[in-house]
């Protein structure tokens, strides 16, 4: 019997979704993004004059500094999108993103039986006690699909 591995689902390819995908890349997560691009709220800014209200050095991934980190300017939304795109390309996380895939429902089904797990110890860290099973309904441009995923927000210190 082939090993059964949990699939990690991440909702949204904004700042947090990209960071989670990078941290969980060794588990091949599936990122559901409702739109056709990354960036979350920064992609859909209503005003071209929108800027971050923090300095760029305070709004950066710890392992991917801004190229002009010491600038005292407040980045525009286009600069933030460029930064997020550079981050996603640098860490090769776009391959995990399923664009135009809106999560419309999530249901908890309970625990799988321990006999369902045949992976080696250490293949996957315990996220929750037991072996939870979730069903995620995703609406795409083509059809509705179901993915079984395990939540990721229970990892400390992502």
Q: What positions do the PLM features span?
A:
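Core residues of folded domains in eukaryotic genome-function proteins
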Residues: 4-7, 25-27, 38, 57, ...
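Hydrophobic/aromatic beta-strand patches that form the interior of the parallel beta-sheet core
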Residues: 30-32, 59, 98, 153
């Amino acid at each position: 019997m082939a090993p059964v591995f949990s699939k990690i689902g991440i909702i949204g390819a904004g700042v947090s979704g990209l960071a989670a995908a990078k941290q969980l890349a060794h588990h091949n997560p599936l990122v559901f993004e409702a739109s056709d691009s990354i960036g979350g709220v920064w992609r859909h800014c209503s005003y071209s004059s929108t800027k971050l209200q923090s300095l760029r050095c305070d709004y950066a991934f710890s392992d991917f500094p801004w190229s002009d980190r010491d600038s005292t300017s407040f980045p525009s939304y286009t600069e933030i999108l460029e930064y997020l795109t550079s981050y996603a390309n640098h860490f090769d996380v776009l391959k995990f993103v399923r664009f135009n895939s809106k999560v419309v429902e999530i249901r908890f089904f309970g625990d799988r039986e321990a006999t369902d797990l045949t992976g080696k110890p250490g293949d996957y860290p315990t996220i929750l006690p037991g072996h939870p099973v979730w069903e995620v309904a995703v609406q795409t441009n083509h059809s509705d699909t179901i993915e079984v995923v395990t939540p990721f927000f229970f990892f400390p210190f992502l």
